């Protein structure tokens, strides 16, 4: 089978950008078993409850659901196991210092294949308060209405 080129997004965490203000993003490799890779290639994963943490100078991804591979045998993986993230030491130290400041967390934003290798985009994020969420929603609606008004004006020939 030929190697895949380019990016193929497997799963995105749409709630993350709604619930958090993402300050920094990083691309990290994932240490996976064979059945996890096969399950991901079928597009089966959920990042909804997922989070990452730094422990002992290593970054870990936890609570990400990758379902068991249907054609797997007794050698299948546990769906919600802890998975190691592959990052440079400087990146891990930078993330760890930010999280230790308080108020910050590490959330997975998307899992994708880049040139045949599974990658996860993680973000260092700060939780949004309820009024921040409402304000962001209001701004989005105002921008959408302004775009509609400009488009209708364009169609009228003004």
Curated annotation (Swiss-Prot):
The entry's localization annotation reads: Cytoplasm
The keyword Translocase belongs to this UniProt entry's keyword annotation: no
- Which keywords has UniProt assigned to this entry? Cytoplasm, RNA-binding
- Pfam families per the UniProt record, alphabetical: SmpB
Q: Where is the composition biased (Basic and acidic residues)?
A: 133-147
The family classification in the record reads:
Belongs to the SmpB family.
Q: What is this protein called?
A: SsrA-binding protein
């Amino acid at each position: 089978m030929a190697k895949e080129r380019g990016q193929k997004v497997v799963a995105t965490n749409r709630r993350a950008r709604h619930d958090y203000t993402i300050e920094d993003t990083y691309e990290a490799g994932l240490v996976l078993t064979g059945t996890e890779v096969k399950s991901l290639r079928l597009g089966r994963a959920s990042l909804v409850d997922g989070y990452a943490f730094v422990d002992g100078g290593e970054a870990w991804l936890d609570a990400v659901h990758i379902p068991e591979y249907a054609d797997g045998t007794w050698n299948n993986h546990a769906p919600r196991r802890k998975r190691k993230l592959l990052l440079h030491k400087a990146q891990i130290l930078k993330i760890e210092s930010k999280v230790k400041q308080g108020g910050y967390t590490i959330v997975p934003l998307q899992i994708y294949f880049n040139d045949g290798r599974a990658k996860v985009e993680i973000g260092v994020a700060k939780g949004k308060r309820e009024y921040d969420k409402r304000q962001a929603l209001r701004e989005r609606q105002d921008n959408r209405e302004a775009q509609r008004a400009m488009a209708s004006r364009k169609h009228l020939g003004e």
